[in-house]
């Protein structure tokens, strides 16, 4: 494991703070949550939503999206300069669902972006509160990760759909800053870099001139972010090669795909944060809870405690199973789309099933869906235990894994062995060890060959009772190893479409 001493903690990145102590970090994160909560309360007042309507996750998503859109400066500028028919660049909106005469109806609302920005700043003591915005982006990203399998995106960049466990954060906007970069998986970074290199191959001017200089520094920055996720010297050396290339092309794409594959066994460190929908923070704030005073952490017990005491509702389509919808949202809340399902079942206290076995579609409702048949139900977001989120990949281990997803990216710091299908992963590494990265490739392959199935990750770490706030008594779970460990198992999840 690379020494973590030099890195600022993710909370520090999120709080622009130089070195802060734990109490300051907790207060600072709490302040961010307070701001989101106050904003949400104000929006519910503006829209005259009932308490039930305000706790509807679909309304929460619309309100979150409106404020993200209002602060998306690059897109706003683009819309001003390229006006499209019937779209007002100064306005933002979306569907709001109301309960009228025993039925759910959809109402499309439209607000001035300026007005939304005013309400947001007012809720955040006059600040732009970018961290609160990033927090909502990560929540949306985690929801996408649990809902969709990015098969098409993987195939388009020349990767393999079975590498989906590396794709955390693949739908995060570019403007999501350091906190966003921290939660991106190795595959996501590789995909962004490959897209960039491909543009350079197709467009002669991509790396040239004034713009080219900016492009180049963005490229090198992304390479460094990816390098920082790897935990072995050979993988890092390979990233140096890719970064220093004079004219990035197919050789670099090859190296990147190689390093992504290697991350299925030699996992990178990817941060995990429990980011909850705004409709959870709002009611907590309005009930008088002071997050800044009490302190809050995205990686400890706090989100679990908050969800134990929250009522969140969701619209349910006619043939959907509310329990399955709950599982989807629960996984999103804990950033756990790529975690081992056996561990998730243990923590949640109810069986967590693979995506393909769930009778539920995404949380968002499309504008052409019929509202007459919509019901709503309570989402069950409580857990039996809690566990500390990890930002390491755990050490490596092999286990029989499934046909769809062939590795996991751990979310919780809990002792277990990490499943991956070694024979499948290794089959991808035949032959190609020539070229300028040959020694690194050989070294990486050797390390992967030596990964042992009986090794345990996160040794001594366990889950905790919800009454054990100080994490004093770790409970090390025991697993039925015959059970299926992968979420996207031979899967039929919908594709993510922008």
From Swiss-Prot:
The keyword Ligase does not apply. GO terms for molecular function: RNA binding; structural molecule activity. The keyword Cell membrane does not apply. One of its GO terms (biological process) is viral penetration into host nucleus. A motif (Unconventional nuclear localization signal) lies at residues 1-18. Residues 1-21 are annotated as: Disordered. A motif (Bipartite nuclear localization signal) lies at residues 198-216. It is found in: Virion; Host nucleus. It comes from the Viruses. Keywords: Capsid protein, Helical capsid protein, Host nucleus, Host-virus interaction, Ribonucleoprotein, RNA-binding, Viral nucleoprotein, Viral penetration into host nucleus, Virion, Virus entry into host cell. Its main location: virion. GO terms for cellular component: helical viral capsid; host cell; host cell nucleus; ribonucleoprotein complex; viral nucleocapsid. Residues 8-21 have a biased composition (Basic and acidic residues). Late in virus-infected cells, may be cleaved from a 56-kDa protein to a 53-kDa protein by a cellular caspase. This cleavage might be a marker for the onset of apoptosis in infected cells or have a specific function in virus host interaction. Homomultimerizes to form the nucleocapsid. May bind host exportin-1/XPO1. Binds to viral genomic RNA. Protein-RNA contacts are mediated by a combination of electrostatic interactions between positively charged residues and the phosphate backbone and planar interactions between aromatic side chains and bases. Encapsidates the negative strand viral RNA, protecting it from nucleases. The encapsidated genomic RNA is termed the ribonucleoprotein (RNP) and serves as template for transcription and replication. The RNP needs to be localized in the host nucleus to start an infectious cycle, but is too large to diffuse through the nuclear pore complex. NP comprises at least 2 nuclear localization signals that are responsible for the active RNP import into the nucleus through cellular importin alpha/beta pathway. Belongs to the influenza viruses nucleoprotein family. This is Nucleoprotein. It comes from Influenza A virus (strain A/Swine/Dandong/9/1983 H3N2). The gene is NP.
